[in-house]
Curated annotation (Swiss-Prot):
Protein name, entry field: Putative F-box protein At1g31072
SUPFAM superfamilies: F-box domain (SSF81383)
Disulphide linkage map: none
Record InterPro entries: F-box-assoc_dom_typ3, F-box-assoc_interact_dom, F-box-like_dom_sf, F-box_dom
Taxonomic source organism: Arabidopsis thaliana (Mouse-ear cress)
Length: 193
């Protein structure tokens, strides 16, 4: 059977239902498949359906206050739901931005409700964070300690603190693990002049 005829044989309601559940980026890319798909995905009916479906998908939102700055850092991620007991939940932060800080609370949003998550240690986020396998990692300072890695497990809503002696503003995802790149210089650059 011809591929074009196979695609045309998909009932429009099934097509719309499938595409209304996809992320916006995937829908946008799918518009390039054919003129028919672009027409369907660009229709007002599909846009309204997609908006309705998007607003029913719960999302997580994290707001973190930096130590010395006038901005709050926001991270957003799809809410992990585990329909089967033995399945693994993987969450990735797909959006982050900064806003002027207006309050000092750490805020957690799940679905349409907001709540504070009590952190056992006062700390001040520094720089951008990363999300690996459902855990948000970010650099923070605390009292006399210049930097540490803070992890927040989205699924269990638990904080962990990892003390390190390196001075850097960046975490990197290396093979599923957060690493903190450090550059140590031994000697003087004058020897290379």
């Amino acid at each position: 059977m011809n591929r074009e005829k196979t695609l045309d044989s998909i009932p429009i309601d099934v097509f719309l239902d499938i595409f209304s559940r996809l992320p916006a980026k995937s829908v946008g890319r799918s518009c390039c498949v054919s003129n028919r798909w672009a027409s369907i995905l660009g229709s007002q009916d599909f846009k309204e359906l997609f908006l309705t479906m998007s607003s029913t998908r719960p999302r997580l939102l994290f707001a973190l206050k930096p130590y010395n700055g006038d901005e709050c850092l926001f991270y957003s991620s799809p809410h992990p739901h585990n329909h089967y007991e033995k399945s693994t939940v993987v969450v990735t932060a797909d959006f982050h931005t900064k806003f002027p800080k207006s309050q000092s609370d750490c805020i957690y949003a799940s679905g349409l409700s907001w709540r504070n998550i009590q952190c056992p240690l006062t700390h001040y986020p520094q720089g951008k964070g990363i999300c690996i396998n459902g855990v948000l990692y970010y650099l923070a300072s605390h009292d006399e300690k210049p930097y540490m890695i803070v992890s927040f497990d989205v699924r269990y809503e638990k904080f962990r603190f990892i003390n390190k002696k390196c001075h850097s503003y960046e975490l990197i995802n290396y093979k599923g693990n957060p690493i903190w790149p450090c550059l140590y210089i031994i000697g003087s650059f004058s020897h290379f002049a």
